[in-house]
Amino acid sequence: GMGLSFKKRIKRLQMKEVAGRFKVVTGLKVSDLIDRLKRPKSANFVVIDSVQYLDVRSFDRLKKELFDRFPRKSFVLVSQVYKGRPKGKMADDIRFDCGVKIHTQGFRAYCQGRYADDAEAYFTIWEEGAAKYYLTE
C-alpha cells in the first residue's frame, strides 16, 4: 500500500482536486499493468516507483513489454540510488536509454540528458526544505 509520507504528500498537494484523473495503484506486476494499459481510456502517464521493485529484471524485456507495446504512453521511472548511480543493472540500462533524466538532491531537481541546456539549472521542489538543506550543506 501507500506509505504515510506519500499519503501526506497527496494531501499537501491537494490531489483530491484531480480525483478521477489521478490514480495510485500499488503492488502491480508488469503483466497486471499491461492489462490495465490495454483498456480504453487507460492512463497516458505511468509512474513506476521504483524499478527495483518490478517483477521484471531485464531492461530489454521491460522495453519490449511496456515501452514498445505502448508507444503513445509516457513512463516515468524512479530508481533508487547507490553511490550517486542508479541501483542495479536494469536501472543503469534505463538511465542510458531514456531521453530525460532528473536527479534530485536537497529538494532540487536537476535535468540531465538530451534536453538540458544548462547543466547547473534546477527546479526547487520545496523551498523551505531546500533552504535548510543548502544552508547546512
Kindly give the residue locations of the regions a language model identified:
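Conserved P-loop
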Residues: 1-32
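Alpha-helical scaffold elements adjacent to nucleotide-binding pockets in ATP/GTP-utilizing enzyme cores
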Residues: 5-9, 61-65, 93-97
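Loop/turn-to-beta-strand initiation segments
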Residues: 18-22, 41-45, 69-78
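Conserved beta-strand segments of the P-loop GTPase G domain that flank and frequently precede/overlap
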Residues: 23-27, 47-50, 76-80, 104-105
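Conserved ATPase-coupling elements of RecA-like P-loop NTPase cores
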Residues: 52-63, 86-88
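Phosphate-binding/switch region of NTP-binding enzymes
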Residues: 68-137
